[in-house]
């Protein structure tokens, strides 16, 4: 008996593993074009945050190239190997999530019971949904009884924990991929055609329930998409630069609400702002829509190109009846509502899915193995070059995590001392820039604080940068500049009370009675998005100042 007949995966043998040429596909060509466009964007808009983003892009490109070469040599063998790895990986995550739910292990987020190895239940749920869709598809495609047992047990474990993540976007992605899978099975296809009205009704009810479950969050995401589209249009074909999404978003949101306030009455007429949008807005840390995020940072052409790559890979995988098609569908839908491509696990998944989608057995242009290997070495050199700088950034992040203790204890002189040395490697970290800038403010170094905070506000949508810069101006007796900065902070996110209170205190310091009384009356009637003990404290402080005016 030959060795190749003993060592077998379902439907494959060692005969399938043989050197092959790599046939280039349209997916490969579009991927190269997209990489070149992102590289041009990186060169046109250089910054520290762009360095970080391009490192991620280089990682995905390298993973895609390596996977593409490996898969082209033996698609079936590599496919089953990766499905087996998926079983191990997702079962490990699911079991860890169950242990977190039952309290035997701690989650990675103090607000949520289960996160797996992730730091948030959203990505955790999305990861499980992607794995579940692949396992379910492989269960229906293969006839192996052994695989049915393995996949069936894995599916059961994942289904048990998935609802605990409360990831609506993950469940929506899973529903989309399972709907496509159902249409490939004749029995289910006939059922859907016969009872389409019932399927439609159930879909509408489920969609409405998902919306109402977290209505405020859903409204916020829709408003974010609206502002993102405006920002993408405003930045033209070249985009704003890699990693600049949040800074551009904050600017665009400010301009949007400023245009409404300008047609109102008085300095800040809150009634002129659309109330639903006022309560829906926030200062996001990520795009929560990967496609619009690419459009804002690299331009609409890059966004369309990326969508085309994903869709083409998806179609090719569906034609091949590959279970990875359903993983890609789930991931693609999940990316509309979340930020998977910021997370290494999803970056690797995306690279592998696209590599499978690009692999073809048919006719096509043949690339020599030497050219393919040279491409990998070139990308490897680029990755290594970026990785060196990334190591310095990672070291600085670790040092800063120790220094943050002093920030929490209000030992600002220690923060400033360490911040000076860490600044060159942490210009991409807006949290560091804010805390370092505020510490400089507390230490009376107002000009230096301004320069640090200005750098931070360019990569963040958080209005707190402008509040602290307003405090810098106030400390230097530049009242009009302080007023403009406080106003900007409020208009950026007009559901926060703090900037209005700073404005009121500014007018009180100036002795401007009329403007103080006007802004204090607005504070009395102001509805904040989140009412806390702190908002009540702020109202109490303004009421105490106001009492001095009414007692006169």
Regions found by a protein language model. Name each.
Residues 431-435, 464-468, 497-502, 532-537:
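Alpha-solenoid helical repeat scaffolds
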Residues 412, 419-420, 453, 486, ...:
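Hydrophobic/aromatic packing residues within the alpha-helices of TPR/SEL1-like helical repeat arrays
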Residues 2-6, 28, 32-43, 51-69, ...:
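Alpha-helical transmembrane segments of multi-pass inner-membrane proteins
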Residues 105-111, 242-296:
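Interfacial juxtamembrane loops and adjacent helix segments
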Residues 113-114, 177-178, 202-236, 240-243, ...:
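Flexible juxtamembrane loops connecting transmembrane helices in multi-pass membrane enzymes
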Residues 424, 454-458, 488-491, 525:
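Conserved structural position within tetratricopeptide repeats
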Residues 488-491, 497, 501-531:
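TPR/TPR-like (Sel1-like) alpha-helical repeat modules
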Residues 1-88, 138-150, 179-197, 360-406, ...:
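Transmembrane signal-anchor hairpin modules in multi-pass inner-membrane enzymes, especially those
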């Amino acid at each position: 008996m030959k060795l190749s007949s003993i060592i077998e995966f379902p439907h494959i043998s060692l005969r399938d593993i043989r050197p092959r040429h790599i046939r280039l596909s349209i997916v490969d060509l579009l991927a190269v074009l997209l990489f070149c466009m992102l590289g041009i964007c990186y060169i046109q808009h250089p910054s520290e945050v762009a360095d970080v983003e391009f490192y991620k892009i280089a990682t995905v490109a390298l993973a895609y190239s390596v996977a593409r070469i490996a898969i082209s040599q033996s698609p079936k063998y590599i496919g089953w190997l990766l499905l087996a790895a998926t079983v191990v990986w997702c079962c490990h995550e699911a079991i860890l999530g169950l242990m977190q739910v039952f309290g035997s292990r701690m989650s990675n987020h103090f607000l949520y019971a289960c996160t797996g190895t992730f730091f948030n239940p959203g990505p955790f749920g999305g990861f499980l949904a992607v794995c579940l869709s692949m396992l379910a598809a492989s269960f229906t495609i293969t006839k192996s009884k052994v695989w049915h047992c393995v996949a069936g047990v894995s599916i059961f474990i994942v289904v048990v924990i998935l609802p605990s993540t409360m990831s609506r976007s993950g469940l929506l992605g899973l529903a989309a991929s399972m709907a496509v899978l159902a249409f490939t099975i004749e029995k289910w296809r006939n059922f859907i055609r016969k009872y389409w009205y019932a399927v439609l009704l159930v879909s509408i009810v489920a969609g409405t329930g998902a919306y109402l479950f977290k209505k405020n969050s859903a409204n916020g995401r829709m408003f974010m998409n609206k502002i993102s589209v405006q920002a993408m249009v405003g930045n033209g074909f070249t985009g704003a630069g890699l990693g600049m999404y949040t800074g551009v978003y904050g600017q665009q949101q400010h301009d949007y609400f400023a245009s409404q306030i300008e047609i109102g009455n008085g300095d800040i007429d809150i009634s002129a702002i659309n109330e639903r949008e006022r309560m829906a807005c926030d200062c996001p840390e990520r795009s929560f829509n990967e496609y619009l995020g690419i459009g804002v940072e690299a331009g609409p052409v890059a966004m369309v190109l990326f969508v085309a790559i994903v869709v083409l890979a998806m179609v090719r995988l569906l034609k091949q009846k590959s279970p990875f098609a359903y993983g890609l569908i789930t991931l693609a839908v999940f990316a509309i509502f979340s930020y998977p491509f910021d997370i290494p696990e999803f970056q690797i998944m995306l690279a592998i899915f696209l590599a499978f989608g690009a692999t073809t057995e048919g006719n096509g242009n043949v690339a020599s193995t030497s050219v393919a290997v040279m491409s990998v070495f070139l990308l490897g050199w680029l990755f290594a070059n970026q990785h060196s700088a990334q190591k310095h950034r990672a070291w600085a992040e670790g040092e800063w995590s120790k220094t943050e203790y002093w920030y929490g204890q209000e030992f600002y002189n220690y923060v400033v001392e360490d911040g000076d040395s860490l600044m060159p490697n942490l210009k991409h970290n807006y949290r560091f820039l804010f805390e370092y800038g505020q510490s400089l403010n507390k230490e009376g170094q107002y000009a230096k604080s301004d320069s640090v905070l200005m750098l931070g506000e360019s990569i963040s949508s958080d209005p707190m940068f402008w509040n602290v810069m307003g405090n810098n101006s106030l400390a230097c007796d530049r009242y009009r500049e302080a007023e403009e900065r406080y106003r900007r902070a409020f208009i950026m996110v007009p559901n926060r009370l703090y900037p209005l209170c700073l404005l009121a205190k500014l007018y009180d310091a100036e002795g401007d009675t009329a403007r103080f009384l006007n802004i204090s009356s607005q504070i009395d009637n102001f509805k904040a998005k989140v009412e806390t003990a702190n908002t009540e404290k702020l109202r109490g402080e303004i009421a105490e100042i106001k009492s001095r005016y009414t007692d006169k």
